[in-house]
UniProtKB/Swiss-Prot annotation:
GO biological process, one term: L-histidine catabolic process to glutamate and formamide
Principal localisation: cytoplasm
Entry-linked InterPro entries: Amidohydro-rel, HutI, Metal-dep_hydrolase_composite, Metal_Hydrolase
Localization annotation: Cytoplasm
Keywords: Cytoplasm, Histidine metabolism, Hydrolase, Iron, Metal-binding, Zinc
Name the UniProt record assigns to this protein: Imidazolonepropionase
Coiled coil, from the record: none
Transmembrane segments: none
Documented EC number(s): 3.5.2.7
CC terms in the record's Gene Ontology section: cytoplasm
Positions with a binding annotation for 4-imidazolone-5-propanoate: 87, 150, 183, 251, 327
Amino acid sequence: MITLIKNIQELLQVRQTSISKVSGAEMAELPTIKNAFLVIKDDLIADFGSMENLPEIKADSIINASGRVVLPAWCDSHTHIVYAGNREQEFVDRINGFTYEEIANRGGGILNSAKKLNETSEEEIYEQSKIRLEEVMRLGTGAVEIKSGYGLTVEGELKMLRVIKKLAENYPISIKATFLGAHAFPTHYKENKAGYIDEIITKMLPEIAQNKLADYVDVFCESGYFSVEETEKIMQAGIDFGLKPKIHVNQFNSIGGIQSGVKFNALSVDHLEIMNPEDIEALKGTETMPVALPSCSYFLSIPYTPAREMIKAGLPLALATDFNPGSTPSGNMNFVVATACIKMKMTPEEAINAATINGAYAMGLSETHGSITKGKKANLIITKPISSYYQIPYAFGSNLIEDVLIDGQII
């Protein structure tokens, strides 16, 4: 099956040779081709270039993209799409003055989601989650990481990971699974934190590894949740079972989680709303991708990740949604890109790089996703007719997507 997309007004994120990520000043550079064509063979990008160099092609399908921008589908490297029910009451509680921490301390927050999840059947969780997955695909996401972390019991965590596996089997979107048993301490372990960590290490991880249910291990390293020492213990156990770490750090406090992530060669460190100079310094020259979650900052009215300082320091940065029922009930990467520009003062070029190639890196997919490169997955966004790609963050409330292709097929 050969598909030709022709007369593309502008083809974005064109990389003749594959790159893994972009950092620092390079993030401001977004290679493009104006008046372009793109050829898809089956599920892969086969060729692209300027229309004046279009070779003779016998295409099975032709898409005329006149006036439209084509770019790689978004790569959302941090989500909690699999959950039961919602936490809309907590949304109203916050409006009425309760903080995220206060809600958590009275049984809300993550523990509320855990209660709902453990009371809901695996089939029902799948049915609820697939609706959210289909929504983010329509919004232009072509690769997504999904975490567990609302089970907080052996069976609850396994149930979540089985749902993630079933979604990956039933949908063309690329899905990476992350085990986040260390999301919070269950109520019955509040006075026995070591006991819960032991359960994660001796009961959850062996089952997960044996059944190949996860690619990564995550920990919520934060005051009132998991300490640096506890985080390191769980990361090491995950590594021993073949799971690379990617961890939650610096959402509310800087307690040394970034340094621990780097020490254990974490694929990514995510949130980063609170960053001090030592945290930025610790990330320099490492293989660990910093990931910002601006929709979470928007929804909780907390600080935004200091993108300008980080990019100025030469760091790479990825953007993701943090789609979850409590702090970011949205999987819209278009809004993430716009919010990064508006609130974090990233340029459109930086934000698109962060949401494509750097997002792919943050879930181990940069060899196959995140750029227009021959041999990569044909996961694409075709916009509606727009004046330029600046419209994507500028018209932040508009749906500018005409078509989404995953594995070369319009969804």
